[in-house]
Each structure stands twice: as structure tokens, then as C-alpha cells.
Amino acid sequence: MKVARIRDSKVKETYSIISDDGKSILTRSEIQQQTGIPIPMNIKDFVFRGWLDEVKHHKAKLKFNHKVSDVDLLVPIPNPPKIVCLAFNYYDHARDAGLTPSDEPVIFLKPRTALNEPFKDIICPSFVTRLDYEAEIAVIIGKETKKVPEDKALDSVFGYMILHDVSARDIQFKDKQFTRGKGIDTFAPCGPWITTKDEISDPQNLHITTKVNGETRQDSSSSNMVIPIRRIISSLSVTMTLEPGDIISTGTPAGVAMSMKEPKYLKDGDVVEITIERLGTIRNRIVYHPL
């Protein structure tokens, strides 16, 4: 199933189930009416405490009454405990950067305040001069996880979504670390919804594309990951407890602006569209804003 947070025409926030084709929605109140299940108000309780599994038993009789285009899609998981990101976790991206891939995850954390809606503007401070894009598969952790073996690591996954790891390269290179240049407010658009893990038979075989103003910039596959998702989860769980709602963004493939001979960094008004097979599409306009 696909689960989303939405805002309707009455400016009311709730959550919904998305139809298989990604075109229609069923709101929380409608789910309750059609199934008779007293589902909770909070999306985290709905997805992490077993209520979604109850609803799945009624999937065949659900009737989707509204179009996705009639609502605003919001950040799927509000206030995640942490956002863990991987650097240089694709062979093609590491090669373009002239680096040898690491056997262990190279990680950094993004602040929750960087999260952004899947179709909302990315607001870039005017002092940023080299703004870059990074399409990534994000994993949503579904249960508390500590020291999980690799062969059981995917049991901890609730689902997957797209995350755009927007990056201010000038700040990143100046600081010689990732957090400030990747942690600016709105620099993590994500969604458009969470696709539950049962719909993704092989997360290591998903096609990934990024287009800027219609021009394809990234065109790769998660099969190019250096460290696969199951090993990422296992490795992280050795040093930190993973919690329900944690987001793990698994790195980006080749094609980013900084690796070009003549870098095409993002400019004011550019539109970045990221599509990942089975996960959907997010689209964001770049808006430079003075301090």
C-alpha cells in the first residue's frame, strides 16, 4: 500500500491511502467508514502500531473517491526521530568523484527542519553559489532496531520513499563536512508517499532518474549501491538504536552537477523532478531568497 499525509481544500491535515496507480486517495475518515475499523488520528500510530495491517485485510473492497490532484501532499512522516544519510554509496557516483567506495557507511545527519513537501519550492539562501541535486531512495524504519543481523535487517523496514538531498556544494567544500551545506531549511523534499515494503520485492533494483527543466541529469539504478540497504541497516544498528519513523537516505547515483566538466548547478526558477521506480515522482522549483 501507499500511505500519505495530505492537506485538503479546507486546509485540514490528515492521512490517506493512495490507490495502486497513484491517482486517487482514500482519507482517514473514509477508511474508517468503509472498514469499520476505529483507526487513530495520528499517522505514526496508524502505520507503526498495526492499524495499517488491519486495513490491508479490507483492501479489495475499498473505494477511492478523490483525486490526488485535489489535495496537497505533505511530508509523509512528521518529525522523524532522525534522518541518517549516506555519502558516496553508489559506485558510479564515487567513480565520478574520484573516490574509492568505503566498505562501511559514510554517514551524516540532516536536521528535521530540512524536510520539505514533495511539490513545494526549495528555498535557497542567496549566499549559496553552487546548489546541487541528489536523488535518493529513503528507507522508513518501522520498529525499534538494535544490532540486527544483515539477513534480518529488512524486517525492520516499514517502507520506502524518495528523498531529494539538496546540497550547497560551496558550503560543503568550505566546511569539509556535510551537515551545514545539506541541512538548510527545505533542503530535503520527500515523498510523494510511503510505499510499504511488501510492494517492493527488490529495493536493490529500482530505476532512478532526475530531470532539471526536462533535461535528464541522473539515470541509474539502485543496483549500483555500494552498500545494500540490508547491510546499511545492520551496520547502523550496531552503533545507534533505530526507531520507528527514522529515515535512512541511501545515497545518490552519478550525474550530479559537481561531477560535470562544466557543472550545471541549479539556478533560481529551475524545476527538479525526481522519479524512482515504484516510489513515484517529486517535483520542486528552486527559489533563491535573500536573507
PLM ranges: what are they?
Residues M1-L86, Y90-P105:
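N-terminal non-catalytic cap/leader segment that marks the start of a structured domain
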Residues A4, L73-V75, R95-G98, I122-L131, ...:
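A generic local secondary-structure boundary/capping motif
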Residues P101-P118, Y133, K267-R278:
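Structural signature of FAD isoalloxazine-binding scaffolds in flavoprotein oxidoreductases
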Residues I141-L163:
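RNA pseudouridine synthases
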